[in-house]
């Protein structure tokens, strides 16, 4: 069965989430949040940001459960996590929200685009 992968980054909500909406219009989706230790080690990341992300992830998971889905929380470098996901169950599209981040998240997004 083909499906689209929705990679949630900082925008952890469904309301007006263009990437989620586009993927859902195409068919089944798998929603993931990748916790990337290297990004959380950046000087502009604080414990409060991490705690807010976890709280938002719990709320997103609850909303997805109400809709019959779930949020998969994965840990690792984004390209490596995507490699593992694709090897286990190939997806045909990858959707994510364009975010404003720092140099590290920009480099990560460029690496994923090359992937």
Where are the regions a protein language model picked out?
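Trp/Phe/Arg-rich N-terminal binding region typifying the photolyase-homology
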Residues: 1-115
């Amino acid at each position: 069965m083909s499906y689209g992968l929705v990679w949630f980054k900082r925008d952890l909500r469904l309301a007006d989430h263009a990437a989620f909406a586009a993927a859902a219009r195409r068919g089944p989706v798998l929603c993931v949040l990748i916790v990337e230790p290297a990004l959380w080690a950046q000087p502009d990341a604080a414990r409060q940001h991490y705690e807010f992300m976890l709280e938002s992830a719990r709320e997103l998971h609850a909303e997805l459960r109400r809709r019959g889905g779930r949020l998969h929380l994965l840990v690792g470098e984004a390209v490596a996590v995507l490699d593992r996901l694709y090897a286990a169950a190939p997806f045909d599209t990858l959707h994510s929200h364009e975010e404003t981040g720092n140099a590290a998240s920009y480099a990560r997004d460029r690496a994923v685009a090359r992937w």
